[in-house]
Amino acid sequence: MDIKHGYAGQILRVNLSTGQFSTVPTGSYADRFLGGRGVALKIYWDEVIPQLDAFDPENCLIFMTGPLCGVPGFAGSRWQVCGKSPILNQFSYANLGGAWGARLKFAGYDGLVLKGKADSLVYLSINNETVALKDASHLKDKGAIESREILKDELGDSFCVVTTGPAGENMVTSATLLADSDSSGSSGFGALMGAKNIKAIAVNGHGKIDVADKKAVKLMRQKVRELKYDPFIWPTTLSQERMEKDICFGCINGCMRVKYHPANGRSGKYCCQSAGYYEVRAQRFYGKVTDVPFQATKLCDDYGIDTRAVETLMMWLSRCHKAHILSEDETGLPLSKMGSLEFIQTLLRKIAFREGFGDVLAEGTLKAANIVGKSADRYITDYMIKTGEDSPYGPRMHITTGLLYATEPRMPIQQLHEVGLPVLLWALRAGGNSDALLKNNYMTSEVIRAISKKFWGDEIAADFSTFEGKALSAAKIQDRQYAKESLILCDFSWPITHSPITDDHVGDPTLESQVCSAVTGMNMDETDLDKIGQRVFNLQRAVLAREDRKGRASDTIEEFNFTIPLKAEFGNPDCIVPGRNGEVFSRKGMVLDRQKFEKMKDEYYAIRGWDVSTGLQTKTKLEALGLGDIAKALQQEDLLV
């Protein structure tokens, strides 16, 4: 495929074992898979054999942008990281914001593939066309924030840096990547950096991205900016006076992401789950509002540890301490001081450097519970999913999300947001708290039903008292989100399901295809773009099938969804959702009906064009999606019907 607009045109490949560099044309992947997750998946399919261990040097660590990256005004400069995750030893993904992805594109590369392992600790420098591996021994054991700042001082402030902390160097399974503006990526990819002996990737570029239709791009930029004006307010106990907006490169109007300026002067990003993971515990311990939650977030960023993994870990540690399964003496942790700065400093240091009991915790909560024994694993059975994360927007409340959790290799937060955020806004309004997250909250029952009809296939998908319409809704959400992850667009901004300026407050599902057409010159409509999303999703399904996630038997969710009644949901303690005809319906005290869930899977498989009895993909469907080569390979491995 000859690509002229929206792409840099090549993907950089680095063999860390040999120190060799090469490039491949982006066009050989972009015709079918567009960019981002799609292109990364095809590279992974081609090069990572199923039996390979995550820490094997031959595992690829793939950094990929999309065709909208570097084009201002669309919130399209996020970038995808993919590889075999050490958490479950299977394919997974993460995406990050900031400006690193755009800078890579300006340097002349749509993506970067790392393979092999360096003999000693190195960092990769990409300065326009000049690429070099350099000694990073002076960064050993240093934090991710500190390492980033050291490299920017050495190379110049125009460089953007992605790095990992000591947790990555010591291959902690929840180790993160940290880029500019404190953007972080999960799935344990910091540990893959450590396994490959690469500390950081510093990028500087001054190129430009050509667009196909400058006039159309300008008009779409203005249209999107007007539609998307909905100022979120993140609920926090910290001082609003110390916060300022922190906007990623090429954003539309900003989001809830802020930069916080604490009393000690060390400012940084404060956003979403990472902002609040220690807030309640700290306030309970100190009895007042402090900067400790922010410091806890920065500690995770600097050590390179996933805040969500730490949050679920702390719940387990607290329960085990109360049950006298774990003591302060045997763990070396001040468990009685959970919520204090001392506790979180000690916990994170021990995990990052694998000190004492920290070596056990570094393997993740699920493995740690099995190692500890003494029935410690029963204290995670009511909230934790297979990757060691919690389960926000869970299926006991939202039903649709059961299929999203069941068919993904990790918590699919982008997909969950498309369902959960409109429902949360509706619940805040229905519960009389209309201004908590969105000024002038207009999310009435009529609006959410109209959104459901336009985006999820039918109004009935917004009735959460029934399973009806949820299978179609799940499929449509996944197709849209996979196209979004290939463009790649920001989750806070896209899809634009609702707007304060339209007469009915409903957004437009065709916007993504309009923007893509204007930038790339690929004339496509909503159906065309959704087909790309469906193709990418099916490629991921094929990848996971080769890694022993084989259809219906693997499309499962945790047992607590069927057995433990729902107690509360974030921001929605009464668990209210839209019911029949938009009436208020509470799912508090409810569980997911197992038989209805399996029947919903039947319907979902049929919609997907897969075999209903096994959940395996079919040759007919894959060929219809232009994946005949994938179908042939799966057929040879007896993974196709």
Regions found by a protein language model. Give the residues of each.
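Basic, polar low-complexity surface loops/patches
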Residues: 1-245, 302, 366
